[in-house]
């Protein structure tokens, strides 16, 4: 895991397996089926990385030989909240890793001026719960920042929120950081820039279209 000096709350997950799978996802010739499988696999790997600092407590268990105090994750079950629609493809990998997690949804689409328009919010109970928001791309950063706003307006502090994405543009990370410096953003790659249409370059195309086999 590495950082970029420009963005204190950005963490780049540079594990070789993550980078290998991301390269295949970038390939325009990768099929919908393979893209979907890779998204699940890469999210599972990234989820493993970002949960390494979860709080731990102990539980008394009896092995076939003795009783011991063994480590377990402390507190309430985590919540996974994909940002619709492409974020749904990431929830499968996270649920494979954390099958007991609660699941919410935040629906946001990007208007013509690239600003987020919210159309759905469904969340589990919020008190004392750690949230993992997920969306494959942080382009302009407005949708990601808005999704965090949804949680914070309901009383979730920034230190209990993580945001997981595959690729991000520096412009979007700056918007994210300015809005929520207390929230950690985890990505597989910090890409070069946004083009004139606010697409990430080099990026991986429209993640939602590639995941669901639709045309923009």
Curated annotation (Swiss-Prot):
It catalyses: UMP + diphosphate = 5-phospho-alpha-D-ribose 1-diphosphate + uracil. It comes from the Bacteria. This is Uracil phosphoribosyltransferase. GO terms for biological process: UMP salvage; uracil salvage. It comes from Burkholderia thailandensis (strain ATCC 700388 / DSM 13276 / CCUG 48851 / CIP 106301 / E264). SUPFAM superfamilies: PRTase-like (SSF53271). GO terms for molecular function: GTP binding; magnesium ion binding; uracil phosphoribosyltransferase activity. The keyword Nucleotidyltransferase does not apply. Binds 1 Mg(2+) ion per subunit. The magnesium is bound as Mg-PRPP. Catalyzes the conversion of uracil and 5-phospho-alpha-D-ribose 1-diphosphate (PRPP) to UMP and diphosphate. Uracil binds at residues 200, 205-207. Pathway: Pyrimidine metabolism; UMP biosynthesis via salvage pathway; UMP from uracil: step 1/1. Its cofactor is Mg(2+). Its EC number is 2.4.2.9. Keywords: Allosteric enzyme, Glycosyltransferase, GTP-binding, Magnesium, Nucleotide-binding, Transferase.
């Amino acid at each position: 895991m590495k950082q970029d000096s420009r963005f204190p709350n950005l963490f780049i997950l540079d594990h070789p397996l993550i980078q290998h799978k991301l390269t295949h996802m970038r390939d325009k010739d990768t099929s919908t089926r393979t893209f979907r499988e890779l998204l699940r696999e890469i999210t599972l790997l990234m989820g493993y990385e970002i949960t390494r600092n979860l709080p731990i407590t102990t539980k008394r268990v009896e092995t076939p030989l003795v009783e011991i105090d063994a480590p377990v994750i402390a507190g309430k079950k985590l919540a996974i909240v994909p940002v619709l629609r492409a974020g749904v493809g990431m929830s499968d990998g996270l649920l494979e890793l954390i099958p007991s997690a609660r699941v919410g949804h935040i629906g946001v689409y990007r208007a013509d001026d690239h600003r987020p328009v919210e159309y759905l919010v469904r969340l589990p109970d919020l008190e004392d719960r750690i949230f993992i928001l997920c969306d494959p791309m942080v382009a302009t950063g407005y949708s990601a920042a808005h999704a965090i706003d949804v949680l914070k307006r309901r009383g979730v502090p920034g230190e209990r929120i993580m945001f997981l994405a595959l690729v991000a543009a520096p412009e979007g990370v700056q918007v994210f950081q300015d809005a929520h410096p207390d929230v950690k953003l985890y990505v597989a790659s910090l890409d070069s820039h946004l083009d004139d249409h606010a697409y990430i370059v080099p990026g991986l195309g429209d993640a939602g279209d590639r995941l669901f086999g639709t045309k923009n």
